[in-house]
Amino acid sequence: KIDYVAIETYNLYNGEPMTLIMAESRINAYLKADQECKEGDLLPFDKEKKQCPWRIVDRMKGTELEGMRYEQLMPWVKPCEKVDDFAPKFVTEYAAAHPEKVFASEDGRDKFVEMESEAFRVILGDYVTTEDGTGIVHIAPTFGADDAKVAKDANIPALYLINKKGETRPMVDLQGKFYLIDELDNNFVNACVDKEAYAHHAGDY
């Protein structure tokens, strides 16, 4: 069991106020003990003097964070899953309950379901430690077998692209470059891609 804290502090890059969550035992790895505000209001941020005050505003267990939703960091593409005989039960059930989110690939061979509402939430895991990091682990289902299993067990859909051949692909190609819109399946783009936002990054490394 890991004890977590909510900390009120500032963004070191722009000085904007923010609240972060981390394992209590990892505070000293990221924040200076002499800048903690134990009483009263949070002191102002001072970039020149490298003063970044902070204070603990709440304490919680990991179980209290389970199910909490968060905003997608780069919301250009919505998660989706393939709907076929090999799809996990949570995918087929979601597709049956939300037929308006089901779409076919351009060639009509495969069906997929957009699943944004089921992603971006906190799950629990016995693999999380406080030896390093913040005590919070980011899971990406398309980046390795371990992440894929954890996500599948927790009913978390994957985030990938679908090309003109109807093939699922990671967010970048083998050169680490974002795919061009024209290289992607039109039906997938219409269902899952914010074309205006994605266009700023298409073709970039």
What role is predicted for each listed range?
Residues K1-Y205:
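Non-cofactor substrate-recognition interfaces
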